[in-house]
């Protein structure tokens, strides 16, 4: 699927934030457009106290390290003046990443043919969560088809999802998606690849913690050194997962006024 999709700064998002995140989005969306960037998402978290996570990109979907720093420098004083958070916070600016949110019609068009998770509100025919392969949105940008795997007999395998009811959507991380993302954006730097390996290890550890396995019985006695005592990590045969481009700033309460 070609990545040459027409998109511009004026294209509205289908998904909007609420509460403090909405106030942050309102404060920065216009200035971002003035710099040639589009806001993807604002999310608040309790990481390191309070963290404001901002995803942005250019209309063509790219976002370099220089872009990230430029956005961080531009919106930091704006948030200082408007003070939508109302306290000290950490500011993180990043690219959308590979398993990115889909927030505009052009996002669905650009990533047609790839797997995604979509949530609707209100539900469609009693169902609000869908996972499958995206098709291209209809010419009016009203609906997007999704092909569902393993559908029960008698039920449709393709459903047209109304984008006006979109609550949340994001791509599903697959080897195919990683390869295509690398093709479009270029390979990551060496340090980014190392960070990606660490993130991948954390994901594996989290999965293991959620589904613990019983350890095999080990007889008591002196421990013998053995090259097979510690299982070796299997080499990844596919492309490495690049990390998102990110810049962070700490905003102390005393510096907000």
UniProtKB/Swiss-Prot annotation:
Localization per record: Cytoplasm
Keyword rRNA processing part of the UniProt annotation: no
Chain residue ranges for the region called Disordered: 182-257
Pfam families from the UniProt entry: DUF150_C (PF17384), RimP_N (PF02576)
Low complexity bias spans: 224-236
An annotated GO cellular component: cytosol
Alphabetic keyword roster: Cytoplasm, Ribosome biogenesis
Biased composition (Acidic residues): 191-205
Presence of keyword Plastid: no
Any one GO BP annotation for this protein: ribosomal small subunit assembly
Family: Belongs to the RimP family.
Function according to Swiss-Prot or TrEMBL: Required for maturation of 30S ribosomal subunits.
Name of this chain's protein: Ribosome maturation factor RimP
């Amino acid at each position: 699927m070609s990545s040459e999709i027409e998109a511009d700064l004026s294209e509205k998002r289908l998904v909007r934030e609420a509460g403090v995140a909405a106030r942050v989005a309102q404060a920065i969306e216009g200035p971002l457009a003035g710099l040639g960037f589009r806001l993807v998402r604002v999310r608040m978290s309790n990481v390191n106290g309070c963290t404001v996570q901002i995803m942005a990109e250019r209309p063509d979907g790219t976002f370099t390290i220089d872009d990230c720093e430029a956005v961080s420098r531009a919106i930091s004083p704006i948030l200082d003046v408007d003070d939508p958070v109302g306290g000290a916070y950490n500011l993180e600016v990043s690219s959308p990443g590979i398993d990115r949110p889909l927030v505009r019609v052009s996002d669905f068009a650009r990533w047609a043919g790839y797997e995604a998770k979509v949530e609707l509100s209100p539900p469609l025919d009693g169902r609000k969560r869908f996972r499958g392969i995206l098709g291209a949105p209809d010419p009016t940008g009203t609906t997007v088809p999704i092909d569902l795997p393993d559908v029960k007999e008698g039920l449709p395998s393709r459903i047209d999802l109304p984008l006006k009811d979109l609550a949340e959507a994001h791509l599903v991380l697959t080897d195919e998606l990683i390869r295509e993302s690398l093709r479009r954006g270029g390979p990551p730097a060496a340090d980014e690849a190392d960070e990606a390996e660490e993130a991948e290890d954390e994901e594996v550890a989290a999965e293991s913690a959620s589904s613990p396995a019983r350890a095999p019985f080990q007889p008591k006695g002196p421990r013998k050194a053995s090259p097979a005592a510690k299982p070796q990590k299997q080499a990844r045969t596919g492309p490495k997962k690049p990390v998102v481009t990110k810049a962070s700033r700490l905003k102390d309460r005393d510096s907000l006024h």
